[in-house]
Structure formats: C-alpha cells, structure tokens
Swiss-Prot record:
Name of the gene this protein is made from: Crabp2
Oligomeric and partner information: Interacts with importin alpha. Interacts with RXR and RARA.
GO biological process, one term: retinoic acid metabolic process
A Pfam entry, by short name: Lipocalin
Name under which the protein is recorded: Cellular retinoic acid-binding protein 2
Family: Belongs to the calycin superfamily. Fatty-acid binding protein (FABP) family.
Compartment(s) of residence: Cytoplasm; Endoplasmic reticulum; Nucleus
Function in brief: Transports retinoic acid to the nucleus. Regulates the access of retinoic acid to the nuclear retinoic acid receptors.
SUPFAM superfamilies: Lipocalins
Xref: Gene3D superfamilies: 2.40.128.20
Binding site for all-trans-retinoate: 133-135
Length: 138
C-alpha cells in the first residue's frame, strides 16, 4: 500500500486557472485563487485506507477526512457542496468522483497518485478541462 503521509510542496501546476474558468469562477476571483494557490501547504495523514488531507493557502484552508470506498461530503474546488467517493484505481492511485448536492455544474473529479520517484500528482477535472499539480515531500 502506498504511503501518502507527509507535508507536500508544489513544484509544478498546469491549467489551474483554465479549470477555474470552466467552473464559472469570475476573472477577479480566478486571479486571487491562482495567486493564493501558487504555494499551497498540503498535509496528508494516512492510516491504511483512511485519509486526512489539509490544504492551506493564504485565502482558504480545506480539510477532508475520508475512507476509500465510503461516500463523504466535501466541497468542489470552487466551494460547492458535493458528495464524493474515492476508490483505488491502481496500487498507487486513488480517484474521486464528485456529485453536486444541489444545482447544476460541470462534472468534477480528482485523483492523487504517487510516482516511483516520490512525486504526488494531483489531477483535478471540470468536464473536459484537466488541471495537473505536482508536489514533492518537504
């Protein structure tokens, strides 16, 4: 079983603003979010299939607790409440499908994968727009 535990720092980000645009976030809020999310602090605690993930930026801090295979409530990256279900896709990759609790919007999901060279790859999607953020342990 992969060990996602640790404090992670971002080294690369692609398409974050484009994903926010696909979610309908206005230009002013996108600029603020992109600046704030340029250096997020990510803390992951893992015990077997149970996870705690805290992501802190200068604008907002999010915390989620979940167990693989059990539905839980969280918020989409743009703050809309949703039900999420995380499953193992492979030995080193978990995928999460999100379902909005109310209203309409793009289909959203995320995945986290540990690479053989120790990087953590976070992929977030909004319909067909894919954002990739790469982290290394601090």
């Amino acid at each position: 079983m992969p060990n996602f535990s640790g404090n992670w720092k971002i080294i690369r980000s692609e398409n974050f603003e484009e994903m926010l645009k696909a979610l309908g976030v206005n230009m002013m809020m996108r600029k603020i979010a992109v600046a704030a999310a340029s250096k997020p602090a990510v803390e992951i605690k893992q015990e077997n299939d149970t996870f705690y993930i805290k992501t802190s930026t200068t604008v907002r801090t999010t915390e989620i607790n979940f167990k693989i295979g059990e539905e839980f409530e969280e918020q989409t990256v743009d703050g809309r409440p949703c039900k999420s279900l995380v499953k193992w896709e492979s030995g080193n990759k978990m995928v999460c499908e999100q379902r909005l609790l109310k209203g309409e919007g793009p289909k959203t999901s995320w995945s986290r994968e540990l690479t053989n060279d120790g990087e953590l790859i976070l992929t977030m999607t909004a319909d067909d727009v894919v954002c990739t953020r790469v982290y290394v342990r601090e």
